[in-house]
Curated annotation (Swiss-Prot):
This is Protein lin-2. Keywords: Calmodulin-binding, Repeat, SH3 domain. Transmembrane segments: none annotated. The lineage of its organism: Eukaryota, Metazoa, Ecdysozoa, Nematoda, Chromadorea. Residues 545-620 form the PDZ domain. Residues 365-422, 428-479 form the L27 domain. GO terms for biological process: egg-laying behavior; gamma-aminobutyric acid receptor clustering; positive regulation of vulval development; post-embryonic development; protein localization; protein localization to basolateral plasma membrane; regulation of neurotransmitter secretion. Residues 310-320 are annotated as: Calmodulin-binding. Residues 633-717 form the SH3 domain. Residues 774-946 form the Guanylate kinase-like domain.
């Protein structure tokens, strides 16, 4: 659909709404992101052109009104909320809540690229939200009929954002028609249930089939059905779903749920409510694997790329540019509608007349796009291993398709060209029209001008110009592909845009000058003979680029260089946030030949860095690009688990580029390109609770700095430990030995294997939540520092908030002792059996009787709504530090000895033990309180626990996913 008419824009302005961005273009509706001026709130606007809707679908306006009515009645946290509707003579404007996130598949791939784990656990998390939304709809007898990734959108970019079900354009209310209805093929072919393909009566169970296909996609990374639309229909009706073949590494519990959701018989298909009670959804903590599914991400990335290209092609066809050269007043705009596009990227409406997509469109303007979309489906089928199974005819069908072979041949020829196209943001059609107007305005045009006008009026040239604009502006969309420059400060970057070839466009062979017009490139010249020893030189000359920018300040360029054995200079590293990174002019691996006309061959790195540091004004690089594919963007947050000072690190390439930090500080990792040195920014210092952070330091660290990677730090720590162990007289060796012995006291043996490398802690991935309720308060500290008194005082003052888990014991009860009040009295055999089943947090023996704290007693405290308060040994955190117990760990530090008398040395011993605990377990602390005064310590703890649930907190990502 073309842009909004001026009258409609004015109507929105009357409501104080302004369009900020175009999200999606359809044949009869567009989706925009809008801003409400008074409240400064963003919303999503779907504008439906009523005339185009009737022309393309053959349906009445009551279909739109039913969608609005259904959305108005749906109020659920996992369903996109309708805010308002605005009606006019020619349009229906539907305003929804704003959603900043991508659809589920794009969001998963993006988060995996940023370093987040994608596992069955994550899939179960989002599947539960989808099923919860569908159960809400189905309880009200509303069938969605278009459940697919496109309509499953994350509410925001935040990693804890919920899933939102949207796209109710073909939803139906079955409450008044007996819970089922007869209809045609509705939805997207790959997600249609068998009864929809057969055009039988459909019910809410059809949504479960579509959700099963979505679940299949999330677990396998690919769709269960591929090929042409007719092939997809045939396979769906055969219910040929190879769950085990596509998911060999997925748990049987997950595969069982997929099979039950993809049951061909609607009456036997699992319902949304039953699926919510499935063990893989209900008990994901134990049934869903947390192992990262890298192969699934790779497959889903291919699926997303194909889907994005299809979406861009459809958006181009549905845009106004597609009809610019052939305006028609009496016919509707050219568009794929209601199943006329192959590949299932348009939602079919079974109520209209043409919904089987059996034949190519009659409109010749769409035939080329139809072939491209069809070829993408063929390519997806070729990538499907099931296409090559015995008995499968998919591969032979594709092989016999002449149009697919021609397109693949054309692709090979394009990839074989020795140069790349120079893409500009100039609207060529507008430029053509302006040139024609200028020629028509001449009083006495020259013969050359008349000839130019004849050429520009040629229908062939007009069609080529139109195709160029459609590809550049609609399909390729340079705005989205550019690696944004971010900051554009006037002091650092020239405000004048550099010519295209200066910003990365390749100079074609034969070009004599810069600009957009080049001499004709004769392809035969590429194949002229030349000596083999000149091949490398020829390749370098054909790839040579000029990079130019303005440098008028003392700001470093933000790159490091390296010189190889041959004296050639390469870009070794680009600091994120630096000048070069913001301008995106260089890339890691680019070879630099000249700087401001001076050769850099056989020069030292120091002299080259000095040359860059002293450069002012216009700086020109002559480079040979590496054409290395850019690594995926990485933006994750970590909590440092060790202290680091770059000025004391002999291994760091550039100490000035390093970031110092302390244990517990929060860092934002920007790049993991270098195996040994990550790039990161400082976020906040320990303790990272609330909105407090080191703002001054954060502002100084806008440019990323270097931190050691986990592999490098683990190697360094292991080497230091080995060196220390060689000297038995070394005090540090004694400390390590004492520490190993310390582990064995009251320690759950099952979990010790998981923490054998406790000394090798580096970083913990975290995420920030605005609110979070901790379930357990853990008090750590040296023996005698006052933890027991603090615990008892808190429980006595706040019995409705805190509770202590009653221990279990094998000794007989004493007089006046009540089972379940003072102790839980159990037999020795029962306690040993529970210990073998790892049901105890910690246990020990005293006077031939066993005592222990059972995990179930802690869970019971949580169920009662209280906070479990524990004064345990530090090793217990290896069990407690999970989402199930959500502990807030407070270290009660011994006071300083200054000004205190210590006749027997007990205070010094207490302080030394406290320091040992801080060194060994400091990375597990959330807060530290120095116990100089016991009453002040208790008051500080009370205030902290009172305000903590409402404070923003940095939590391990494993607690959220």
């Amino acid at each position: 659909m073309r842009e909004l008419d001026p009258d409609e824009s004015n109507l929105l302005l009357d409501e104080q709404l302004s369009i900020r961005d175009v999200i999606e273009q359809g044949p009869f509706s567009n989706v925009y992101r809008i801003l409400h001026g008074p409240s400064n709130r963003k919303f999503l606007l779907r504008s439906i052109n009523l005339n185009l809707f009737r022309q393309h679908t053959g349906l009445g306006f009551e279909e739109i009104d039913e969608e609005i009515r259904i959305c108005q009645n749906l109020q659920h946290p996992y369903i996109c909320r309708l805010e308002k509707t605005i009606n006019s003579v020619h349009y229906r404007h539907i305003i929804f809540e704003n959603m900043e996130g991508n659809d589920i598949c794009f969001e998963i791939v993006q988060r995996a690229s940023n370093g987040f784990v994608f596992s069955e656990y994550v899939v179960s998390h989002y599947t539960r939200q989808l099923l919860d939304a569908l159960d809400y709809c189905h309880t009200r007898k509303i069938v969605h009929r278009d459940v697919r990734p496109h309509n499953l959108v994350l509410a925001s970019k935040d990693t804890s954002a919920p899933l939102k079900l949207c796209g109710f354009g073909v939803a139906k209310d079955l409450s008044e028609i007996g819970g089922s209805m007869a209809c045609g093929r509705v939805g997207v072919p790959q997600f249609m249930a068998p009864e929809i393909v057969r055009k039988d009566r459909v019910s809410c169970s059809s949504d479960i089939w579509s959700s099963g296909v979505v679940l299949f996609l999330l677990l396998a990374g690919r769709l269960p059905f591929s090929g042409s639309t007719s092939d997809i229909y045939e396979r769906i009706m055969q219910t040929d779903v190879d769950v085990d073949g596509y998911m060999p590494n997925i748990s049987e519990s997950a595969r069982n749920l997929v099979r039950r959701m993809l049951n061909a018989d609607p009456s036997k298909r699992i319902s949304a409510k039953e699926a919510l009670n499935h063990e893989w959804i209900r008990d994901k903590e134990h049934m869903a694997s947390r192992k990262h599914m890298n192969d699934v991400i790779d497959q889903m990335r291919r699926y997303n790329e194909s889907r994005k290209l299809k979406s861009n092609v459809l958006s181009a066809v549905n845009s106004g540019r597609f009809d610019e050269t052939t305006p028609r007043q009496d016919t509707p705009q050219t568009a794929f509608v209601d199943g006329s596009s192959p590949g299932g990227d348009c939602c079919h409406r079974g109520e209209s007349s043409s919904n089987d997509a059996a034949e190519p469109p009659a409109d010749k303007d769409l035939s080329g796009a139809y072939k491209v979309l069809g070829s993408l489906d063929a390519i997806n089928s070729l990538l499907d291993p099931n296409s090559y199974k015995p008995g499968s005819t998919t591969f032979q069908k594709i092989h016999d398709d002449g149009s697919v072979r021609n397109l693949l041949r054309l692709y090979d020829k394009i990839k074989a060209l020795p140069c790349e196209p120079v893409v500009t943001e100039v609207d060529t059609s507008t430029l053509r029209k302006e040139t024609l107007n200028q020629i028509d305005g001449l009083l006495g045009p020259s013969p050359e001008a008349l000839e130019l006008r004849q050429l520009l009026n040629s229908p062939h040239l007009a069609s080529c110009v139109q195709a160029l604009d459609v590809v550049v502006c609609e399909i390729r969309d340079p705005k989205n592909e550019a690696s944004g420059s971010g900051d554009k400060e006037g002091n650092c970057v020239s405000s004048d845009p550099a010519p295209a070839y200066l910003n990365g466009g390749v100079l074609p062979l034969g070009a004599q000058r810069a600009g957009t017009s080049f001499e004709h490139f004769n392809q035969s010249a590429v194949h002229t003979s030349y000596d083999e020893e000149e091949e490398e030189l020829y390749d370098c000359m054909s790839r040579l680029r000029l990079v130019q920018f303005q440098k008028d300040t003392q700001e470093p360029m933000g790159i490091t260089l390296k010189v190889n054995e041959d004296g050639r200079c390469f870009v070794a590293r680009i600091m994120h946030g630096g000048m070069i990174h913001r301008q995106a002019t260089l890339h890691v691996g680019d070879e630099i030949r000249e700087i401001n006309g001076m050769s850099v061959a056989n020069r030292s790195v120091e002299s080259l860095q000095e040359m860059l540091r002293d450069a002012r004004g216009q700086v020109t690089f002559k480079i040979i690009p590496s054409y290395r594919s850019a690594p995926p963007a990485c933006e994750i947050f970590v909590r440092a688990q060790f202290d680091y000072e770059p000025s004391q690190d002999d291994l760091i390439p550039c100490p000035q580029a390093g970031i110092p930090f302390k244990t517990g500080d929060i860092l934002q990792v920007i790049s993991k390109d270098d195996h040994n040195w990550w790039q990161a920014r400082f976020v906040s210092s320990f303790p990272s609770i609330g909105n407090s952070s080191n703002a001054q330091r954060s502002n100084q660290q806008q440019v990323a700095g270097l931190i050691p990677s986990p592999e490098l730090q683990e190697w360094r720590t292991a080497c230091l430990a080995m060196e220390r162990s060689k000297n038995t007289c070394n005090t540090h060796c004694m400390w390590f030995n004492k520490k190993k012995k310390y582990y064995t006291t009251k320690y759950l043996q099952k979990h010790s294997a998981l923490f054998d490398q406790l000394d090798l802690v580096t970083y913990e991935e975290v995420m920030r939540l605005s609110q979070y309720r901790r379930k357990t308060l853990v008090l750590l500290g040296a023996h005698g520092v006052g933890r027991r008194h603090i615990k008892n005082t808190l429980i006595h003052r706040h019995p409705n908030r805190f509770a202590y888990p009653i221990p279990h014991t094998t000794r007989p009860p004493r007089k006046d002792e009540v089972d379940g009040k003072h102790y839980y009295f159990v037999t020795n055999e029962q306690m040993m059996a529970d210990i073998q089943n790892n049901e105890y947090l910690e246990y020990g023996t005293h006077e031939e009787s066993m005592y222990g704290t059972k995990l179930e007693t802690i869970r019971n405290i949580h169920k009662s709504g209280k906070i479990a308060i524990l004064d345990v040994e530090p090793q217990a955190l290896k069990v407690l530090r999970t989402a199930e117990y959500s502990p807030f760990v407070v270290f009660i530090a011994a006071p300083n000895l200054q000004g205190m008398q210590d006749p027997d040395g007990s205070l010094e011993k207490l302080l030394n033990e406290s320091d040992v605990l801080r060194q060994a377990f400091g990375h597990l602390f959330d807060f530290i309180i120095t116990n100089s005064d016991i009453d002040d310590t208790i008051a500080q703890l009370e205030r902290l626990v009172e305000k903590l649930p409402a404070y923003p907190q940095w939590l391990p990502v494993t607690w959220v996913y």
